[in-house]
């Protein structure tokens, strides 16, 4: 019923004429209601009053669960309040159900939380920060909650996309990625300066991390323009070549901007010369593709 309230809110909120409100909800794979949660967006079967067809949903999966699936073990569903095991089910059966629903409906998202936290920036590990969940489309993995200074953080997405359909036109441009990273740095600074006080936690998080997400759009259009099948070896070669180029340029831009404008506070505290804690995010691009 609480999820249904959020479901109704997304229908009531819109961003002008661009797109209506949207939200994603995440629960851990050991939550007692995980089986019903998996079917949240399936339009048929179950109580229609407990469906939420306008929300996106994701499952937070620790390594422990995947080990249980691998070994065909029982999996304990725990109370969120005191972590007491309420009942046990087959991990493998639950995994099959998750995969089947994802194949049929496209969701839920899977967030491999232990892997995510192993891959966060080193200065965030040193600060004891932790990623607890993801965002609307599961491409953002930023820390939330109370940090070492006792401040509450709310993650902020500051995104932009390179158009790969025109990759051949800009691939040799020496500063295109750096220019976009400068643009994103200016955008996040504008948010920090102008956002209302009601967004204080988000402003604080953006100020400390300066995390941005440079992504891409038009990858399939690029392959079509080159007459390359999506699942071919050549598509994989282009994929690695393009993203290697973008990543290296984004990393270099972060260092350059740190020297010019100073490192972000999270990195600077540990002597790391990085303007951005996070630099890339491959987000869905439905709205900007039209």
Identify the role of each PLM range:
Residues 134, 287-290:
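Gly/Pro-rich active-site capping loops and adjacent beta-alpha segments
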Residues 7, 11, 36, 160-161, ...:
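Contiguous, well-ordered alpha-helical segments that form the cores/surfaces of helical PPI scaffolds
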Residues 1-2, 13-16, 102-206, 216-222, ...:
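Function-dense linear segments that define catalytic or interfacial modules
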Residues 1-5, 15-130, 216-264:
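Conserved, charged catalytic cores of large soluble enzymes
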Residues 13-14, 24, 97-100, 146-148, ...:
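Generic recognition of flexible, low-complexity loop/linker segments
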Residues 29-31, 161-163, 284:
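Short, structured patches in soluble enzyme cores that scaffold and shape functional sites
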Residues 23-26, 66, 74-76, 108-110, ...:
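Structural motif
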Residues 18, 179-203, 207, 211, ...:
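Internal maturation/activation junctions in enzymes
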